[in-house]
Amino acid sequence: MNQTLEEVVSLARQCGCGHRHYDIPIEQMVVGREAFARLVAYLRHKRYERVAIVADDHTFAAVERSLCDQLENGSIRYTVCLVQPDENGDVIADERSIVQVLLETPDDVDVLIAVGAGTIHDITRFSSYKMRIPFISVPTAPSVDGFTSMGAPLIIRGVKKTIQAQAPIAVFAHTGVLCQSPKEMIAAGFGDMVAKYTSLADWQFAHWMADEPYCPFVHQLTEQSLQTCVDHIDDIAAGGEQGIRVLMDALLQSGIAMLLMGQSYSASGAEHHLSHYWEMEFLRQKKRQVLHGAKVGVSTPIIIEHYQRVFWPLLNELEKRPKSMDEATWERLKANTASIRELLESLPSPERIRTMLAKVGGAIAPEQLGIDPQLVERSLREAHRLRLNRFTMLYFLNELIFVE
């Protein structure tokens, strides 16, 4: 991170935005080759004698020798729950995976350890919350910014829902393990960071148009983590330890920013809603899943194109109020027109986003992910309904301007 955890907490206390800043429950956050040794020391300090590792076949294989040797040398007893994939070979954060973890975790376990990427963390986060025990994060790839999140995006009866659960009490990310993660997962992590361009724009817009809680400090933290990745794109693309550490630190800082606000506005906007919509459609069609970061990376330039194509004509024709919009909202839109123009102009071009994604080895078009143009168009009309309490420019356009 650009600041230490202690510095972030201190700066948050000095913030004058007027909104509540939540306590950060994370006691330690270690990114480096000493991570697993520090994990064992932390477990002993907390007097956790029995732990349960939650992983899948691939993530457990990535750490089995290095992590388990450390646990055994530290006299830490552990069990392992390997979450089983579905019929397509995907590990899904759904009811089946959660029930498996609940059934296989011994009653006397002190803490769960999530060993994996986003999906394993979501399963562990919710399961530990329901079991009323803490969990520790051990990322095996720098692929998402949700490691430190309280929210668990789950598939419940085929529908994507984000359920507030709990954040990890500590994070131990071994850079040696992270550097060995598949290139597509590193590209996905960069994609999740690139998505902050539109999520931050949506958040600012929601503050202006719907009085959503907004904090300049949290915005700055998120923007800073994004810019650091952009500035070090060559290092990240090279896949060396320096670049991977930069990416991991940025993902963690973005997650800490969400924790401070108690919600994910800073990191998740319309681009995430498109991604969730595509994910649900793939589940319905029983197609193999695509990495979350790959989807939001691809959806970000799509959202930018959509906003610039649709919003500019609207801002140029403010004489007549649409029948679907009340007078107060119309007046607010007119009052904020200059700011909205500036916001749209500040977004990078879709071509620049795609160039950056390609540089780190990521997909740049939905077709590369098996997403056809019809699904993209449908998601632009309907994806905002997955989270109607999240005010975005996409929500505004679909619900208040182009009402079907």
Curated annotation (Swiss-Prot):
Gene3D superfamilies cross-referenced by the UniProt entry: 3.40.50.1970, Dehydroquinate synthase-like - alpha domain
Gene Ontology molecular function: glycerol-1-phosphate dehydrogenase (NAD+) activity; glycerol-1-phosphate dehydrogenase (NADP+) activity; metal ion binding
The record's remark on the cofactor is: Binds 1 nickel ion per subunit.
EC no. given is 1.1.1.261
Entry binding sites for Ni(2+): D192, H272, H292
Cell location? Cytoplasm
Q: Which cofactor does it need?
A: Ni(2+)
Q: Where does NAD(+) bind?
A: D56, G118, T119, I120, H121, D122, T140, A141, P142, S143, S149
Known Pfam families for this protein?
A: Fe-ADH_2
Q: Which GO terms describe its biological process?
A: glycerophospholipid metabolic process; phospholipid biosynthetic process
Q: InterPro entries, from UniProt?
A: G1P_dehydrogenase_bac, G1PDH, Glycerol_DH
Under the subunit heading, UniProt states: Homodimer.
Briefly, what is this protein's role?
Catalyzes the NAD(P)H-dependent reduction of dihydroxyacetonephosphate (DHAP or glycerone phosphate) to glycerol 1-phosphate (G1P). The G1P thus generated is probably used for the synthesis of phosphoglycerolipids in Gram-positive bacterial species.
Q: What is this protein called?
A: Glycerol-1-phosphate dehydrogenase [NAD(P)+]
Q: Which gene carries the instructions for this protein? A: egsA
